[in-house]
Amino acid sequence: MRTAVIIGTGMIGTSIGLALRKQGVDSYLMDTSPVALRIAEAVGAGTAEEPPETVDLAVVAVPPVHVAPVIASHQSRGTARFYVDVAGVKVSTRRELDALGCDLATVVGGHPLVGRPGSGPLAARGDLFDGRPWALVPAVGTDAAALNRALELVAACGAIPVVLDAEAHDRAIALGTLVPQIALTLVAARLTEADSGALRLLGSVWSEIPQLVGVDSATSWTQVLAANAAPVVGELEKLSRDLASLLETLRGVADGDGSLAEPDGRLLEFIQRGIDGSNRVPGRYGIPTETALADVDVSVDDRPAELARLFDDVAGAGVVMRGIDISQRPDSPDRTVTISVTPRDAENLLHELRRRKWPANS
């Protein structure tokens, strides 16, 4: 990838521009806000000039409700060969793209998951995506070259690609981000009725709890919530049943004499289930990552779908990638893909890749 257009210069779009510029990609910036556009250009995310020709990739970093119309508009103008969005909802976005007659073969749904609060180009960082998961959601008819280009984008930004279908993505986002945010919002709403003494007591404690969506990003968040309503309802119903069970247990405890005693076994089971669930999430999102990583280098030729095939084989080996880098070999069109894994996984990955006829070395 040599050229890219970033459409939308908020925190995500500007951070992508910064990461691509670091990799030598010529980045062109577009935004309906002249102020945001000037700031993104000033911080070094790219140029606000029009690209002189069709670019390799357009990254659509706009609010969810605008993704489909923006892609449709730029496809009709021939802005880019391929398109990737970064919205947090995929099923409804694909439905809208289809309704607008977009060429879905050139579009890959994308969604980088970053925990940094903030918005706007001044909150951007070139390393924002380092080691973070980045969902890629190709359609059944997505061109292999489009997916390869999207994988290059993710690698250039230092993120870890996770390829899955739209329904699985939306279920995961409902469970892992939207429902927790809803629960936190409901708890925070109770603070409106707390007395001032309680609020002073809770000040430092509350600041350590994961932050609520801010006013500046509330609109985008509610758009994602509304578009993802069906899977969110399903998860909330499960959560409601768990909460009802917990309430029953706690009522039994509350009816006691109030003395300190060994914890109720059902309460311990409740806590343990949460610990077990958290421990299923790899890397920094649950199980601690070992400080030392091992690299496995794989030579990948420039045939369509080779990058996608490699990542499928890595996943098939049961290995979690902790880092990825793609470099062009100076003497050939082939690329070297460096996959960082735990030392424990490196030997297994090397064996599996060689078994699948990949030229791999550690």
Swiss-Prot record:
Please name the GO terms of the biological process aspect recorded for this protein, alphabetically: antibiotic biosynthetic process; tyrosine biosynthetic process
The pathway to which it is assigned is: Antibiotic biosynthesis; novobiocin biosynthesis
Q: Does the keyword Transmembrane apply?
A: no
**A single MF term (Gene Ontology):** prephenate dehydrogenase (NADP+) activity
Q: Could you tell me the superkingdom of the organism this chain comes from?
A: Bacteria
* InterPro entries per record: NAD(P)-bd_dom_sf (IPR036291), PDH_N (IPR046826), Preph/Arog_dehydrog (IPR050812), Prephen_DH (IPR003099)
Per UniProt, the keywords (alphabetical) are:
Antibiotic biosynthesis, NAD, Oxidoreductase
> Which of the seven top EC classes does this enzyme belong to?
oxidoreductase
> What Gene3D superfamilies does this protein's entry cite?
6-phosphogluconate dehydrogenase C-terminal like domain, NAD(P)-binding Rossmann-like Domain
Q: Which Pfam families match?
A: PDH_N (PF02153)
Catalysis: reaction(s): prephenate + NAD(+) = 3-(4-hydroxyphenyl)pyruvate + CO2 + NADH
Record EC number = 1.3.1.12
Q: Does the keyword NAD apply?
A: yes
Functional summary from the UniProt entry: Probable prephenate dehydrogenase that produces 4-hydroxyphenylpyruvate (4HPP) in the novobiocin biosynthesis pathway. Novobiocin is an aminocoumarin family antibiotic that targets bacterial DNA gyrases.
Q: Which family does it belong to?
A: Belongs to the prephenate/arogenate dehydrogenase family.
**Which NCBIfam families does the UniProt record give?**
PRK06545.2-4
> Under what name is this protein listed?
Probable prephenate dehydrogenase NovF
